[in-house]
From Swiss-Prot:
Cofactor note: Binds 1 zinc ion per subunit.
Enzyme superclass (EC): ligase
Function: Catalyzes the attachment of threonine to tRNA(Thr) in a two-step reaction: L-threonine is first activated by ATP to form Thr-AMP and then transferred to the acceptor end of tRNA(Thr). Also edits incorrectly charged L-seryl-tRNA(Thr).
Protein name as it appears in the record: Threonine--tRNA ligase
Domain annotation TGS: ranges: 1-61
Biological-process GO terms, alphabetical: threonyl-tRNA aminoacylation
HAMAP family cross-referenced by the UniProt entry: Thr_tRNA_synth
Pfam families in UniProt: HGTP_anticodon (PF03129), TGS (PF02824), tRNA-synt_2b (PF00587), tRNA_SAD (PF07973)
Gene name of the encoded protein: thrS
Length: 635
């Protein structure tokens, strides 16, 4: 008999060799019906996996991230099967699950069309109805290559040949279709209830522009049609809110072919950026942080010492100066560490909180670039905290509270994830255990709900990730707290303890916005470009009906500017209705309309983006109203 520990801590005994699907049935028939995959000792596996030793088990449904992943991974295989049935000469490349669904890349001597997608979708429905079992099998390297050569699948052959010697080479079979795949998958095609093919795109093989351009079909999958319909409605809303479209319409930023992945911020975009950074600085000063600035370019040796060279080299840019090798920083931490090392520190100095709005550069493949969300140059709102082991819990709690304050200001709900040790990591088991427990205890002490993401920590330590949920239900990972015992060791950091001896500090890396650029992109979409008054690049649009009000308009403009209210004037010889419509398209919070009546009464006619026509009030009353709105940062 083997002992299986369930997620709730309950221990059950079963015969050795029992399948996970059978355990799900014994736990509850309702759970068995919803089950899609499982986690065994933190590793995601198929439900048909047999258990031969004592293990911890979590049954995954569509409510779980990896349950969704397994279902959508199977959706990609169903798409490939449908394409091969309809167009047998097409060659298969890769087809993974992604956050929003799945895709598959194909090589074809024709171009897929929207009409073809409809035909493929109809075939997908047939395959789902046929309810084929997904059966995993493994082959030795040469047999695996022969199988794919026999099927004329050149890309699969290349993938197998690139695998390390001794790597397990697995396949999944469903009906008449077999694909190279590590899994996991759901038990049968019938589990994938609702599929929708969404779009077509070009994609270079392996993301390399020197390789052949393939055709990518995107899709998504759900267990219920109602969930699919809700998602499709969200996509329509997301199109209206696309920050790339609104960024252009509202004149906030642009990206040019002379610098792909390097955003250009325009004056209005800079206003938003400066407000976010000023607020960040104010709150960090209140919370006891000291701001630093470190160079963009640092010697290559530093990146070897930090470990970034081994773990991050492919994402870095390099240059040569005075016959020396240098790298443009992809992260701020090594530079921040040099600031710490520049002085001797006593235990009385700790915790030491150093913050930096540091520009970093990371190489992203051209196909992955996406407006402000995925760029090659961005400002990371970093802070690095140095502390004793005894201070870990209190400092982590303080960071969580600061992050919470920021996200609530912008009206974001969020969820928290604790990510544990990855395979590619540095440091001892003991350090990782202390670090992980430190983060866990901080979360538990303030009653913050979280889920555990096994194996997704940074290479130098475990982390807490904060995922924002926007107003249309999408999630964005922004803030992070990473506990690090490794960097202090690598850089021989120390402080003098109460005993007069040298001790090693604990280091914490953390961000709140994550990337300032990306956070602005998220805000553009969160507000659909209609920023709250305190954040709006233009807070008031001032317009006259005829030239007769021009002198009064200039006096009103001057009064607004004296009160630090951002105002634009529209004195064009256009109909007032046209001016109003244009200001509405620019999503400006307030319009002040001046006609002869307003001049005579010394008032302003106020039109609010939110509440419509507010009538005529004194200029002093309006200034008091808007200043209060800005002060309290009303959303």
């Amino acid at each position: 008999m083997i002992k299986i520990t369930l997620k709730d801590g309950k221990v059950m005994e079963f015969e050795e060799g029992i399948k996970i699907s059978d355990i799900a049935m014994k736990i509850s028939p309702a759970l068995y019906k919803k089950a899609l995959a499982a986690k065994i000792d933190g590793e995601t596996v198929d439900l048909m996996t047999e258990l031969h030793k004592d293990s911890s088990l979590e049954i995954l449904t569509f409510e779980d991230e990896m349950g969704k992943w397994a279902l959508r991974h199977t959706g990609a295989h169903i798409l490939a099967q449908a394409v091969k049935r309809l167009y047998p000469e097409v060659k298969l490349a890769i087809g993974p699950a992604i956050d929003t669904g799945f895709y598959y890349d194909f090589e074809a001597d024709f171009t897929f069309t929207p009409e073809m997608l409809e035909k493929i979708e109809a075939e997908i429905k047939k395959i789902i109805k046929e309810n084929h079992k997904l059966e995993r099998f493994e082959l030795p390297r040469e047999e695996a290559i022969d199988l794919m050569k026999e099927k004329n699948e050149d890309y699969k052959v290349e993938l197998i040949e690139d695998l390390p010697e001794g790597e397990v080479i697995s396949f999944y079979k469903q009906g008449d279709f077999t694909d190279l795949c590590a899994g996991p998958h759901v038990p049968s095609t019938g589990k994938v209830k609702s599929v929708k093919l969404l779009s077509l795109a070009g994609a270079y093989w392996r993301g390399d522009e020197n390789n052949k351009m393939l055709q990518r079909i995107y899709g998504t999958a759900f267990t219920k049609k109602s969930e699919l319909d809700e998602y499709l409605n969200m996509l329509e809303e997301a199109k209206k809110r696309d920050h790339r479209k609104l960024g252009k319409e509202l004149d906030l930023f642009s990206i040019h072919e002379e610098g792909p992945g390097f955003p250009f911020f325009h004056p209005k975009g800079m206003i938003i950026r400066n407000i976010l950074e000023s607020f960040w600085r104010e709150e960090h000063t209140k919370a006891g942080y000291q701001e630093i600035r470190t160079p963009l370019i640092l010697n290559e040796a530093l990146w070897h010492q930090s470990g970034h060279w081994d773990h991050y080299k492919e994402n870095m840019y390099f240059t040569n100066i005075d016959d020396g090798d240098y790298a443009i920083k992809p992260m701020n931490c090594p530079g921040g560490i040099l600031v710490y090392k520049n002085s001797m520190h006593s235990y009385r100095d700790l915790p030491l909180r150093l913050s930096e709005l540091g520009i970093v550069h990371r190489h992203e493949l051209s196909g992955a670039l996406h407006g402000l969300m995925r760029v090659r140059c961005f400002t990371q709102d970093d802070a690095h905290l140095y502390m004793t082991k005894e201070q870990i819990k209190e400092e982590i709690v303080g960071i969580i509270k600061l992050i919470d304050k920021f996200y609530k200001l912008f009206g974001f709900e969020y969820f928290v994830e604790l990510s544990t040790r990855p395979e590619d990591s540095m440091g001892s088991d003991e350090d990782w255990e202390i670090a992980t427990n430190g983060l866990r205890e901080a979360l538990d002490s303030i009653g913050k709900e979280y889920r555990v993401n096994e194996g997704d920590g940074a290479f130098y330590g475990p982390k807490i990730d904060f995922h924002l949920k926007d107003c249309i239900g999408r999630t964005w990972q922004c803030g992070t707290i990473q506990l690090d015992f490794q960097m202090p060791e690598r850089f021989d950091l120390s402080y003098i303890g109460a005993d007069g001896e040298k001790h090693r500090p604990v280091m914490v890396h953390r961000t709140i916005y994550g990337s300032v650029e990306r956070f602005i992109g998220i805000l553009i979409e969160q507000y659909a470009g209609a920023f709250p008054t305190w954040l709006a690049p233009v807070q008031v649009k001032l317009m006259n009906i005829t030239d007769a009000q021009y002198d009064y308009l200039k006096k009103v403009e001057e009064a607004l500017k004296e009160n630090n209210i951002r105002v634009e004037i529209d004195t064009r010889n256009e109909k007032i209705g046209y001016k109003i419509r244009e200001a509405q398209l620019q999503k400006i919070p307030y319009m002040l309309i001046l006609g002869d009546k307003e001049v005579e009464a010394g008032k302003v006619a106020v039109r609010s983006r939110k509440d419509g026509d507010l009538g005529a009030i004194s200029l002093e009353e309006f200034i008091e109203k808007i200043k209060n709105e800005i002060k309290v940062k009303t959303n």
